Amino acid sequence: MPGRLLRGLWQRWRRYKYRFVPWIALNLSHNPRTLRYVPEESKDKVISDEDVLGTLLKVFQALFLNDFNKQSEILSMLPESVKSKYQDLLAVEHQGVKLLENRHQQQSTFKPEEILYKTLGFSVAQATSSLISAGKGVFVTKGLVPKGAVVSMYPGTVYQKYEPIFFQSIGNPFIFRCLDGVLIDGNDKGISKVVYRSCNGRDRLGPLKMSDSTWLTSEIHNPLAVGQYVNNCSNDRAANVCYQEFDVPAVFPIELKQYLPNIAYSYDKQSPLRCVVLVALRDINQGEELFSNYYTIVS
């Protein structure tokens, strides 16, 4: 029994140490390959915000159309011009079929990961990591991820640097710190899960969801929302993805916000919602595990 307890504690420490500041300070110089250097905060982006936005809109729109049968309440609240846009897109997708009349006879057979593959040419999913004692990891399950592609998103509750996160952070290896001090809690268990669900329900406007909470379950609607399980690179395994911060613009379509896997801890109309995406640093083949740099050094 003591041996099993010690092994459990050791495994938890191996995962948590990358968030423990004293350990980081003492070990940075020993693992130079695990660091990512940028000259200044403004040059931290691998691709433009426009490219990130374009990818998210493309994927979310495809998910929306695939689930069109269940969107009737949302569509009833949208302007006619927006409804017409989706009807036209749906008609193009199913050429020659009067979908607006017959859609109820057709059952959507595509899973979210299949939609991701059809849209971007690859799919990703959680699986047991190839690293010993690393727990879960994220793999390319199908297709090829081209360099510069958005390959996943880091889900979770977004905290401004002045907001309380002490209790949520205890023993939590899923706290992501942005360059400006904003924190994202990507833990899908315990108090973190409760907080996210509470904020998700708070911001809902009737049928309009302002964020996606399915990443907390086994039935994920946004197949990109697995970024919290991407493991740190090592001296033996170089990073093939990197984190990139992205602020959701005010013009983001309200009907597609149901796929955003992030929610602000405090309701604040003034601040844009912070998201973090993972971008491919090179072409990544099917079967490869994703590895990132947990540390970015701004010089």
Swiss-Prot record:
S-adenosyl-L-methionine binds at Y294. One of its GO terms (molecular function) is lysine N-methyltransferase activity. SUPFAM superfamilies: SET domain. Transmembrane segments: none annotated. Keywords: Methyltransferase, S-adenosyl-L-methionine, Transferase. One of its GO terms (cellular component) is mitochondrion. One of its GO terms (biological process) is regulation of signal transduction by p53 class mediator. InterPro entries: SET_dom, SET_dom_sf, SETD9. It is an enzyme of class 2 (transferase). Residues 122-295 form the SET domain. This is SET domain-containing protein 9. The gene is SETD9.
